[in-house]
Design a protein with these regions (language model features):
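Nucleotide-activated donor-binding/catalytic signature segment of Leloir-type glycosyltransferases, i.e.
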Residues: 250-268
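Short alpha-helical donor nucleotide-sugar binding micro-motif in glycosyltransferases
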Residues: 96, 267-268, 275-280, 371
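Conserved acidic donor-binding segment of nucleotide-sugar-dependent glycosyltransferases
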Residues: 320, 324-331, 340-345
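Short alpha-helical segment that forms part of, or immediately flanks, the ligand-binding pocket
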Residues: 274, 293, 297-301, 315-316
C-alpha cells in the first residue's frame, strides 16, 4: 500500500539516501513500517545535510515530489509566495493520484493546499496537527484556516492532535508522538533510576534547554530568570539548538556576566542530546506556543524536573506532580520556580521520578501500535503491517 505525505520538512538526497530533520524522520520510519511506499511532497534542498539530520531507514521505498528548492532549511525557510501555489497544486495532485492513502502533516502552507485538494482524490485520509490545537495568540491566519478545514466535514479522515479538548468532532483524536525507541526508553529509565535522591544538594542545579533558538521559544526569558537569581542562586544552563536568536542571546549572556553559567552547544546529533538529558537535573521550555512539547516528554523519561508553559497540552503533561508550569513570558515566575527546585532537591527528585514512570508509555513502538489501531478503525481495514504479507 502506498502512502502520500505532505510536509513542510525539507529533504536532501545525499549518498544514495533521503535525509531530513531527525525527529521527523524517526517518526516517519514508523509510518514506513505500515506502508510499502511513501510518496512525499516536500521542499527539496541541496548540499550535504546538517548534523541534526538523519537518513530514512529505507530510502528505496521513498519518492520525493518537490514543490520548491533552495529556500532555506526547516523553520528557517522563506515563506511561500503566491507564485509557488501552482507548483504546490501540481505536486500534491501528482502524489494523491499515485497513492492509496494520504497523510497531511499540518500546520504548513503545503498542508493547507493538501487539506483542500486531497479529499477530491482520496477516501483514505489522515492528518496530524503538530501545533497547539486550541490556538495561540498571534498565530497566522493560514494556521487557523487549516484547523478549520481539518475540523470540518470536508476532511473525511482522523486528525491526530495533542491533548483531549472538549466540544471536538469525533474525527479529532487525542494522540501523542515520540522519537524514543524501546532501547532509548530503557536507557532513559536506567538514567532516571540511577539519579541520586539528594540530587543537587551539594552543587549547582544543572538546567537544560533543547530546541530552536527563536523568539517564540522564549529562551531570553530563561536567561533573564537566571540573571534575576544572581548572586543568591547559581544555576548552570546548557542550551542545545540553534536559530536566529542565538547572537542576541549570546550578547545578553555577556552583558549579564552569565558566561560561567551558560553554555551554547548548537545543533547536535540526537544521541548527544540523550547524553545531555542524562547529565542534567532539570529542563525548561516556556514557549509562547507549543504542540506536544517533545523535549519535555523526552526529559521526563530521563527523570528530569521539567518547567513548561501554562498553555496548550503542557499543563496536562506536567500535571499531578510531574512538573511545574509558569506563564510563558514571566521571567520572575520562572525564577521563582527555579529557586524552588534548586532549594528542594529531595522533593523534586520525586517529581522527576513520577515524570519518568508516567512517560514510559510514549515510545516509537507504542506510536506504531497506536497508528495501526487508529487507521484500522477509521479506514475499516485489517491491521496495517506491510512486513507480514504486505498491506493490501
Amino acid at each position: 500500500m502506498k502512502l502520500g505525505v505532505a510536509t513542510i520538512c525539507p529533504h536532501i538526497f545525499h549518498e544514495g539516501q533521503w535525509w531530513s530533520y531527525e525527529p521527523y524522520v524517526l517518526e516517519m520510519n514508523v509510518w514506513q513500517e505500515l506502508f510499502e511506499e511513501l510518496v512525499i511532497v516536500a521542499p527539496h534542498d541541496q548540499g550535504p545535510p546538517p548534523e541534526s539530520w538523519v537518513p530514512y531507514r529505507d530510502s528505496s521505498s521513498i519518492t520525493v515530489v518537490p514543490f520548491r528548492r533552495d529556500r532555506g532549511r526547516g523553520l528557517l525557510q522563506e515563506p511561500a509566495s503566491f507564485g509557488e501555489i501552482p507548483r504546490m497544486l501540481y505536486a500534491v495532485t501528482k502524489a494523491a493520484l499515485t497513492a492509496d492513502a494520504f497523510h497531511v502533516r499540518a500546520p504548513g502552507n503545503i498542508a493547507l493546499v493538501a487539506s483542500l485538494l486531497v479529499p477530491l482524490f482520496q477516501k483514505r485520509l489522515v492528518a496530524k496537527f503538530a501545533g497547539q490545537w486550541i490556538g495561540a495568540p498571534g498565530e497566522a491566519r493560514t494556521v487557523r484556516w487549516q484547523r478549520a478545514i481539518l475540523k470540518s466535514r470536508w476532511w473525511r479522515g482522523p486528525v491526530t492532535v495533542y491533548g483531549d479538548w472538549p466540544n471536538q468532532p469525533p474525527h479529532i483524536v487525542p494522540f501523542f508522538t515520540s522519537v524514543l525507541d524501546n532501547h532509548q526508553m530503557a536507557r532513559a529509565q536506567a538514567a532516571a533510576a540511577n539519579r541520586n535522591a539528594a540530587g543537587w544538594a551539594d552543587r549547582n542545579l544543572r538546567l537544560l534547554y533543547v530546541g530552536r533558538l527563536s523568539a517564540s521559544k522564549n529562551v531570553a526569558v530563561v536567561l533573564e530568570a537566571l540573571a534575576q537569581l544572581k548572586p543568591a542562586v547559581t544555576i548552570e544552563l546548557d542550551i542545545v539548538g540553534d536559530g536566529p536568536e542565538r547572537a542576541a542571546l549570546e550578547r545578553f549572556v555577556n552583558e549579564q556576566d552569565l558566561r560561567r553559567q551558560v553554555r551554547f552547544h548548537g545543533n547536535v546529533a540526537f544521541d548527544r542530546v540523550l547524553e545531555f538529558y542524562e547529565q542534567a537535573d532539570a529542563l525548561t521550555l516556556v514557549s509562547a506556543s507549543e504542540g506536544w512539547g517533545k523535549a519535555i516528554t523526552e526529559a521526563m523519561a530521563f527523570g528530569l524536573v521539567c518547567i513548561g508553559s501554562n498553555l496548550g497540552v503542557i499543563p496536562w503533561l506536567l500535571g499531578e506532580g510531574r512538573g511545574l508550569v509558569v506563564p510563558p513570558n514571566d521571567a520572575t515566575a520562572l525564577a521563582s520556580a527555579l529557586r524552588e527546585i534548586a532549594g528542594s532537591p529531595i522533593e523534586h527528585f520525586q517529581t522527576g521520578q513520577r515524570a519518568a514512570a508516567w512517560s514510559q508509555r510514549f515510545s516509537l513502538e507504542g506510536l506504531g501500535n497506536a497508528l495501526r489501531e487508529l487507521l484500522g478503525k477509521h479506514w475499516r481495514m485489517p491491521e496495517l503491517n506491510p512486513h507480514s504479507d504486505k498491506a493490501k
